[in-house]
């Protein structure tokens, strides 16, 4: 059955969307991305040190700034649009911004958390900071590009900013930060309106800078991720039949409902904007619930990690090594078949899972420039 897209082009698992044919009705000369580790292509690595091996091993052959064994959804989006992979704004080495820039960094929240990376594990590059980075990039890039030469080939053309696709995948860390701070799910729920308000303000600010095409992912089922499940003891009654923590998934759904409603309102106020709300929650949840039916061997267990029910240990992360009998060996080692795993390291999805998600949402890219 053909999918029926709402005025927001909301994409869900219930729509039987076929994989991308790479034939797009929309032409985007650039992508500007904002978010967290779900779409970070090297921002946090540039700021605080490279994510080491075995990250990147399934595709790049070496670490590539991504907390994944290979490509992220944003990489597949770039590929499908015929664009190069996005360089991280924070990465000064080997970057090319002619077709956009990536302002996402792992651990980034929408709201500033007023803590350091070492204190909380969350990035200081919140969404408002990412917007300031974009604002400065937008203005300075054209000044520098006017010098000609190599600058002209490494920076976007001025009209790329109004024709670009602006992508967002952020919000997960705002929810988990509250939970990790010993707040109840109910307490975190009361913060959702303010979180969404700040999210919408960022979009309005980008619109004010000429952005017109927005592609917004909702947040995933955090109650199915080992780093959240293992953080605190949960009552048996909190788990659903698939092993996920129901109250936390409900929290994510509450966030998504508020986000969708805010986008509906925003479309009426930003008359020239085309805003696509993308339901990745349903797709990710489908992978956790019916992993084997989609060619995966497991769902909750991490591919890369160490010990425990979920092959996850906060103190022994993916890629961690130690000296054994004079030799350096992996303790947080990867599984033999990452292409059969849903979760890479207890926090992030594998390249195979990202490809599954992308294939389902890809048809919406051909409509992401359409206003209704």
Curated annotation (Swiss-Prot):
One of its GO terms (cellular component) is apoplast. The active site is at 37 (nucleophile), 345, 348. Its main location: secreted. Its EC number is 3.2.1.51. It holds the Pfam family Lipase_GDSL. Glycans are attached at residues 96, 114, 139, 182. It catalyses: an alpha-L-fucoside + H2O = L-fucose + an alcohol. GO terms for molecular function: alpha-L-fucosidase activity; hydrolase activity, acting on ester bonds. Keywords: Apoplast, Glycoprotein, Glycosidase, Hydrolase, Secreted, Signal. It is found in: Secreted, Extracellular space, Apoplast. High expression in younger leaves and in the apical region of the inflorescence stem. It is an enzyme of class 3 (hydrolase). Residues 1-23 form the signal peptide. Belongs to the 'GDSL' lipolytic enzyme family. PANTHER family: ALPHA-L-FUCOSIDASE 3, ZINC FINGER FYVE DOMAIN CONTAINING PROTEIN. Hydrolyzes alpha-1,2-linked fucose. Also active on fucosylated xyloglucan oligosaccharides. This is Alpha-L-fucosidase 3.
């Amino acid at each position: 059955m053909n999918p029926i897209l709402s005025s927001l082009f909301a994409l869900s698992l219930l729509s039987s969307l076929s994989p991308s044919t790479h034939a797009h009705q929309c032409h985007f000369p650039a992508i500007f991305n904002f978010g967290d580790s779900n779409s970070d292509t090297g921002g946090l690595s540039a700021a605080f040190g490279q994510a080491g091996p075995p990250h990147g091993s399934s595709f790049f052959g070496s670490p590539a700034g991504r907390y994944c064994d290979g490509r992220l959804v944003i990489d597949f989006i770039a590929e499908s649009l015929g664009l190069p992979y996005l360089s991280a704004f924070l990465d000064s080495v080997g970057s090319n911004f002619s077709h956009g820039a990536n302002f996402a960094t792992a651990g980034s929240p929408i709201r500033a958390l007023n803590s350091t990376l070492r204190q909380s594990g969350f990035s200081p590059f919140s969404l408002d900071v990412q917007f300031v980075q974009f604002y400065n990039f937008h203005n300075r890039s054209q000044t520098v590009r006017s010098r000609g030469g190599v600058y002209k080939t490494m920076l976007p053309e001025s009209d790329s900013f109004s024709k670009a696709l602006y992508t967002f995948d952020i919000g997960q860390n705002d929810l988990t930060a509250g939970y990790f701070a010993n707040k109840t799910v109910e307490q975190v729920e009361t913060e959702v309106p303010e979180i969404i308000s700040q999210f919408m303000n960022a979009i309005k600010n980008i619109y004010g800078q000429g952005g017109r095409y927005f592609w917004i992912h909702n947040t995933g089922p955090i109650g199915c991720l080992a780093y959240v499940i293992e953080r605190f003891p949960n009552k048996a009654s909190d788990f659903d039949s698939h092993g996920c923590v129901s109250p936390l998934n409900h929290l994510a759904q509450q966030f998504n409902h508020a986000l969708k409603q805010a986008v509906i309102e925003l479309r009426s106020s930003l008359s020239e904007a085309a805003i696509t709300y993308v339901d990745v929650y349903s797709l990710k949840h489908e992978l956790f619930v019916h992993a084997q039916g989609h060619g995966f061997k497991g769902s909750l267990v991490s591919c890369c990690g160490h010990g425990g029910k979920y092959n996850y240990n906060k103190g022994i992360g993916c890629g961690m090594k130690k000296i054994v009998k004079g030799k350096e060996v992996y303790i947080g080692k990867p599984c033999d078949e990452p292409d059969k795993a849903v979760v890479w390291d207890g926090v992030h999805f594998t390249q195979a899972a990202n490809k599954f998600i992308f294939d389902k949402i890809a048809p919406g890219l051909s409509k992401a420039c359409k206003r209704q």
